[in-house]
Each structure stands twice: as structure tokens, then as C-alpha cells.
Amino acid sequence: MKRKEGKLKGYKGLNLYYQYWLPEGKPKAVLLVAHGLAEHSGRYKNLVDYFVPKGYAVYALDHRGHGKSEGTRSYVDNFNDYLTDLETFFGMVRKENKNARIFLFGHSLGGTIATAYAVEHQEGLAGLILSGSSLVPSTSVSPALLAMAGVVSALLPKMGVTLLDASAISRDKAVVDAYVNDPLVFRGKVPARTGAELARMWKHLPEQMHKIKLPILIMHGFADQLANPAGSKLLYERVSSKDKTLKLYDNCYHEICNEPEREQVFMDMQAWLAKHI
């Protein structure tokens, strides 16, 4: 396995960090990873260690305001900025892998980004894989908090409004401890503008889901308290894809790739990918 890293210019000239892992020989396909809110590309070691030895290349970008990329921590001025950055990153990955089949993998916020991206940019993608996507309001997010985020976003967009509950990411204590102690994970309050932009996507994305015609694998932990599983069910119902699969994992928390059942999750992903390459 070979690991490389680099930087690219994102929207408005922001320096964005990325890293990628290559198998020995020509890749079977490419997994392009869009990570979740407040985390970074380096937290996908389990996925990398499973898929790269099996012949897949994995490319992962740190979103603006995340990990080793520039920008105010966990802040986005407009959700479309994420999509523009991803389009730039996809172009780079495509250039380096001209004939490869590229699958977009999105987790949590990255699932929101991947879904929104697929609505407008299906060309060049072989398929979409989603994990714990944030597509509708979480049951832990009150209407009052959503309303407050919208008001504060207009006045003080970078003001922190809510903390993410680290204990809700996984039932594996080692995963939670590593998350809490990771210097590249943002442990402060999520900025109001970011919350408001995510809420905007929750409102408008359901109206656009029917535009997706790609092969799609939708996965979600049934006990996820950070991203509502109802969003994944809604996406499954509304996409126009004839080739669509929904996998719900009993007892699993938000990060199904970091849960005790992760081996089964990866086996399900691998079986799905094998049918699409």
C-alpha cells in the first residue's frame, strides 16, 4: 500500500488538504471519500485498511475548515462551497485515474455533500455509497435550535451554537477516546452558519432526490442519534435509481465503519462494489 498527500486550491483560493492510498498494481476502482462534520480524512483508516489491500484506491479530502485544510473550524459560508471543492477534487482524481470507475462515499455531513453533489454531477460517477447521511433533522435537534441557528447565522455566522456528542459516534470506547483526543477533530461548538446551511439542505434536498439515477448503496445505523435514519429511508424511496440498496444495522450508532459490526459493513460494501465494477 502506498500513501501520498497533497494540497489543492478550493473555492476562493482556500488551500485544501487531501491524501490517498494506492494498492499494488492497477486499482479495481476508486473510492472518493467525503468525511463528516468536525472530523477529517485521517479517520478512515479502517476503510482504507480493508479496501486498499483488496485492490481499491482510496482518495479523501479534508473539507474546508476541517483537518489540515484552511478555513475557520467546521465553518462553511455557503453549502455550495463544499460542492465546488468536491468538484475540483473529483476532477483531479479523474485526471489521475482516467479509465477507473469512481465511487463517491459520503459519511454524515459527507453524505449530505455526496447526495447534493450527485443531484447535479452524476456524470463520471460509477455509483454512490452513503453512511449515516444527514438528510433530515436529527431527533436530537429541536425546532427552536434550528430557528436560533438561522437568526444567529444572519447576525453572527461564526458563533458556536451546538456541540456534537462524542459518545454517540460509536459503541466502541476506544473509537470515542481516539476521537476526543484527536487534535484534528474540532471539539468546539458548530458555527451557526454551518448549522443553518445544513438545515437549508434538509429542507431542499428531499425535493431533488428524484434526480439521482446512479447505482446507490445507502447504509445507516438504526440506533444513530446524530443523523436520523429516516433520512436514508426517504432517500431510498425518492431516488429514481433502479439499482438501489438500503442497509440498516441494528444497534449501530452513527459511525458504522467504526462500530463493532464494521467487518459486516465492509463485507456488504465489498459485495455491492463487486457487482458494479
Kindly label every feature range from the protein language model.
Residues 1-25:
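N-terminal cap/lid segment of alpha/beta-hydrolase-fold proteins
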Residues 28-36:
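Short beta-strand element of the alpha/beta-hydrolase
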Residues 38-41, 67-101:
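Catalytic nucleophile-loop/oxyanion-hole region of alpha/beta-hydrolase
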Residues 43, 48-71:
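Conserved alpha/beta-hydrolase
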Residues 107-190:
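Alpha/beta-hydrolase-fold enzymes
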Residues 212, 218-220, 224:
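Short beta-strand/loop motif that positions the catalytic acidic residue
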Residues 214, 228-237:
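Short alpha-helix in the alpha/beta-hydrolase fold that links the catalytic acid
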Residues 245-277:
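Catalytic active-site module of serine/aspartate enzymes centered on a nucleophile-bearing elbow/loop
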